[in-house]
């Protein structure tokens, strides 16, 4: 396959998958908009499916082979021989023709392919920068020696049924509790605010991070991140990543509030104390990345009505069928 065919095939597939993702994202947005009682776990799965559709549609291409009907017999054309009369033809002068369309398509397709590869490279370089930053934070973090914190952590992990609890460390480089690395996970606490955190706040913060661990969010987050890298130019990819991350945080907030020991207003005060902080990927912080996300999380705490559980599985399966 030459470079022109490769560029045309990849660009056409990017366009087709992008249009499909636009329709699917519109459907998911309408469902989340007009079903406010839909639980956060289902919302997270729906946006994860939007991102997965983009990745799978791009990397896995299997055209459906349709059976062809046999061609109808075509009557042979009747050739009538006619006497040719002598004629004199003037040979036209050769003129310079226009630039072939293949050359123009070659230039456009290859340039677009190069631009797409450059964009993916920029996204990958930014991700590697975050990974290197997180690696430095984990390397410089020290083991937690506070007996109060260790006792609360062990009791909470035992009550939640976490058999292999992540190593608990303290870091001077973070502002919020953070669960880092999908492999050999580490739970880091900010050294600046650890001494001033009460037992209830510390227990809720640890519960939130352990909820991420139980949900395996660090592993599932790779699919939306991959869609954002491959479709960096598509607004739906960024929307799916943002809404999936928000629904994921709300699901962990709901897991904390399901514990009868914690009240919504107490947890809301903790979210305000944690404030706004960004975590390098792959890591999950208890703080909100933006003030808008913090406001949305606080508003979700006000929903005291029970979420819609019935039909959530059927809804997810329906979205899978449409994807």
Predicted feature locations:
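Alpha-helical transmembrane segments of multipass membrane proteins
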Residues: 29-33, 226, 297
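Hydrophobic membrane-embedded segments
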Residues: 1-125, 139, 143, 147-165, ...
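Short helix/loop segments within enzyme catalytic domains
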Residues: 58-65, 144-170, 207, 214-216, ...
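Alpha-helical transmembrane segments of polytopic integral membrane proteins
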Residues: 24, 28, 52, 121-134, ...
